[in-house]
Structures are given as structure tokens and as C-alpha cells.
UniProtKB/Swiss-Prot annotation:
This is Elongation factor 1-beta. InterPro entries: eEF-1beta-like_sf, EF1B_bsu/dsu_GNE, Transl_elong_EF1B/ribsomal_bS6, Transl_elong_EF1B_B_arc. The gene is ef1b. One of its GO terms (molecular function) is translation elongation factor activity. Keywords: Elongation factor, Protein biosynthesis. It comes from the Archaea.
């Protein structure tokens, strides 16, 4: 099996969410078998709201990004998590 690069979009609960703190909290819950690739990037959405874009390297096995998605969704301040892209590397 190989590895997969997955790009996830994390939407904060509101414009007032502390993105610096949220980034740190997301880094702290990355599950075993996944690693952060690059920095967590802020992407402007609208009216001051910014999404966080996280790129992870995960194993190419069943349920590859699900542990990370579930861990990120449980972080305080996260509204939702969406996989934008996933491709084999």
C-alpha cells in the first residue's frame, strides 16, 4: 500500500473563532498514521470568515481520512470538516 495526500477544509464556528488557537488544537489531534504536510492555511470565505485548509499524508487503506475527519470535527470551534481532494502519491 502507498500513501495518499488529502486536503481538508475545516470551517470554524464563527468569524470570532480564534484561528491561531484552532490551528494548534487541530495539530494536537492529528491521529496516528497521519502527518501534517506543510502549514495549515487560512482561506477567506466571506464577510471575514476564513476556512482552514489542512493537507495530510495518510495511509492508502480503507477509511484513510476518516480518523482525521472525526478527530478534527470534535475540536472545539470547528463547525464542519470536508475533504476537498485526495490523491495517491
Amino acid at each position: 500500500m502507498g500513501d495518499v495526500a488529502a486536503k481538508l477544509k475545516i470551517m470554524p464556528e464563527s468569524v470570532d473563532t480564534d484561528l491561531v488557537g484552532l490551528k494548534e488544537n487541530l495539530k494536537n489531534v492529528i491521529p496516528a498514521g497521519a502527518q501534517l504536510h506543510g502549514d495549515i492555511v487560512e482561506e477567506p470565505i466571506a464577510f471575514g470568515l476564513k476556512a482552514l485548509i489542512v493537507t495530510l499524508i495518510v495511509n492508502d487503506e480503507e477509511g484513510g481520512t476518516e480518523p482525521a475527519e472525526e478527530a478534527f470535527a470534535k475540536v472545539s470551534g470547528v463547525e464542519n470538516v470536508q475533504v476537498l481532494e485526495a490523491y495517491r502519491i
